[in-house]
């Protein structure tokens, strides 16, 4: 059964882990409303209390359709609880096909929503400083939501702007001035990161490891070698916008008002449109040039600031979907302000999903699916639970993964990706009536690398994979 949290609320599923704690899905037994609960252990690090206090203050300032909604917080002893929207659509990276990207029409839609959210943040003097696909969530209507304000800061107050000097973010997404300069303006840094996200959506890969002279791919970009990957996969109109967004000099970089006037940003792209451009120039070895998206690169050794370098070194906790209830409802008040939190945490809350009291109709698998985060990394098997489990373990062991049985029906897989970065993901075996579901969830590392590994495992297990489509639609 689900674990009681506050009166009428149960913790039913783990959504993600982070450096200081985890995010759980809380569901109201009476209304079936869902909220993401970020549970932070304040004793994990000396700077944790101050960082969480800052994150809460910034979240309180935010109110925009493209920003994950913050409902409130409460503290019990050394545990801090943050209550946020539950975004059932999952993370943006899950919509990006490795080395391919996504349809240009979809990329444009998500990019427009991203720019709307970033424009709002800048209008109230806040910079995010860690924009990447893993921090961009989707609700049930595919509305993009910017999440994770752990590295965000205020750069303008009462009309007075300050320069930033803190080296933070995720290396492939950071602007070059963060590496080169001791002080820099906030706005252009977020614009640069948005450009890298757009590149990932259109090409399914990142352009470089880091934006400096030691990276050949970045030097090629500055030399305008657009016949190389990933640029050769991007049509001329969006590439022209990227050239303006990924301009090395921040003073020459395009601003958000001008992005909104750009031809590609404003044009109506027909569904299914496939465009190509004539490419001239030399050839390249794509296996050498391919730069996968990853989010766990340590950039501390680049810091030249007196401020402590802030790293985004783990898979961000998924927050997340636009709530339909009144934010002043007694149910939310009870969750945020109520008494009697149960501190008995389940050993493996993911496995309690099917037995939770949140299910409105006993035995209804559809209600279960309505509470699952939308992901493409899951499949049904056509064998029983025991055979599914043994097949998974045998396959992953042969493929060289480090296996750890976390608890009943959950396995943690660890490996290194093609760039020698740590990759950890969990596999839950879920029994649904006469069906067995293998649900893969990224815990730490790069989203696209995780998807590559999932596809390889699925292919190896092809003999037991069912052709039945997994709900909800992906």
Swiss-Prot record:
Q: How is it modified after translation?
A: Phosphorylated by atm in response to ionizing irradiation. Phosphorylated by atr at Thr-314, Ser-344, Ser-356 and Ser-365 in response to various stimuli that cause checkpoint activation, such as hydrogen peroxide-induced oxidative stress. Phosphorylation impairs binding of the C-terminal autoinhibitory region (AIR) to the kinase domain and thereby enhances kinase activity.
Question: Impact of altering residue 377 to E?
Answer: Enhances kinase activity
> Which reaction is catalysed here?
L-seryl-[protein] + ATP = O-phospho-L-seryl-[protein] + ADP + H(+); L-threonyl-[protein] + ATP = O-phospho-L-threonyl-[protein] + ADP + H(+)
Know the name of this protein? Serine/threonine-protein kinase Chk1
Impact reported for residue 135 to A: Abolishes kinase activity; no effect on interaction with CLSPN
Which organism's genome codes for this protein?
A: Xenopus laevis (African clawed frog)
Pfam annotation, one family: Pkinase
Q: Which gene encodes it?
A: chek1
What does the UniProt record report as the effect of altering residue 356 to A in this chain?
Abrogates phosphorylation and activation during checkpoint signaling
Where is the PTM Phosphoserine found along the chain?
344, 356, 365
């Amino acid at each position: 059964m689900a674990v009681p949290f506050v009166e009428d609320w149960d913790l039913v599923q783990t959504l993600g882990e982070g450096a200081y704690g985890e995010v759980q899905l809380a569901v109201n037994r009476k209304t079936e409303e869902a909220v993401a609960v970020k549970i932070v252990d304040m004793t994990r690090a000396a700077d944790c209390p101050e960082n969480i206090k800052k994150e809460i203050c910034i979240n309180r300032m935010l109110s925009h359709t493209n920003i994950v909604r913050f409902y409130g917080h409460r503290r019990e002893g050394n545990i801090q609880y943050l209550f946020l929207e539950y975004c059932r659509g999952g993370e943006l990276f899950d919509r990006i096909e490795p080395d391919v990207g996504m349809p240009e029409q979809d990329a444009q839609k998500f990019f427009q929503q991203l720019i709307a959210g970033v424009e709002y943040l800048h209008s109230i003097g806040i910079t995010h400083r860690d924009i990447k696909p893993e921090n961009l969530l989707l609700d049930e209507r595919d509305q993009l939501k910017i999440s994770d304000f752990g590295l965000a800061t205020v750069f303008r107050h009462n009309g007075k702007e300050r320069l930033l000097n803190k080296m933070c973010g995720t290396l492939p997404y950071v602007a070059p001035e963060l590496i080169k300069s001791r002080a820099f303006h906030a706005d252009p840094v977020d614009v640069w990161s948005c450009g890298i996200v757009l590149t990932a959506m259109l090409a399914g890969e990142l352009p470089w490891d880091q934006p400096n002279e030691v990276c050949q791919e970045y030097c090629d970009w500055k030399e305008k070698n657009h016949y190389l990957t990933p640029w050769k996969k991007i049509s001329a109109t969006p590439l022209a916008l990227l050239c303006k967004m990924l301009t090395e000099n921040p003073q020459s970089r395009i601003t958000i008002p001008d992005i909104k006037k750009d031809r590609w940003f404003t044009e109506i792209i027909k569904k299914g449109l496939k465009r190509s451009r004539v490419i001239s120039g030399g050839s390249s070895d794509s296996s050498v040039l391919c730069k996968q998206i990853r989010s766990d690169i340590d950039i501390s050794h680049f810091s030249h600031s007196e401020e402590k370098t802030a790293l985004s070194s783990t898979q961000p906790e998924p927050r997340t979907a636009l709530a339909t209830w009144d934010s002043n409802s007694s149910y939310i008040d009870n969750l945020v302000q109520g008494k009697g939190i149960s501190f008995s945490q389940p050993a493996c809350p993911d496995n309690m999903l099917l037995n939770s009291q949140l299910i409105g109709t006993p035995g209804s698998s559809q209600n279960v699916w309505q509470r699952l985060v939308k992901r493409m990394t899951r499949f049904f098997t056509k064998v029983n639970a025991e055979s599914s489990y043994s097949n998974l373990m045998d396959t992953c062991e042969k493929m060289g993964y480090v296996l750890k049985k976390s608890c009943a029906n959950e396995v943690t897989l660890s490996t290194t990706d093609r760039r020698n970065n740590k990759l950890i993901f969990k596999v839950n075996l879920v029994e649904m009536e006469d069906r067995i579901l293998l649900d893969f969830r990224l815990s730490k590392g790069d989203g696209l690398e995780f998807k590559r590994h999932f596809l390889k495992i699925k292919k190896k297990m092809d003999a037991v994979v069912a052709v039945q489509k997994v709900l909800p639609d992906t």
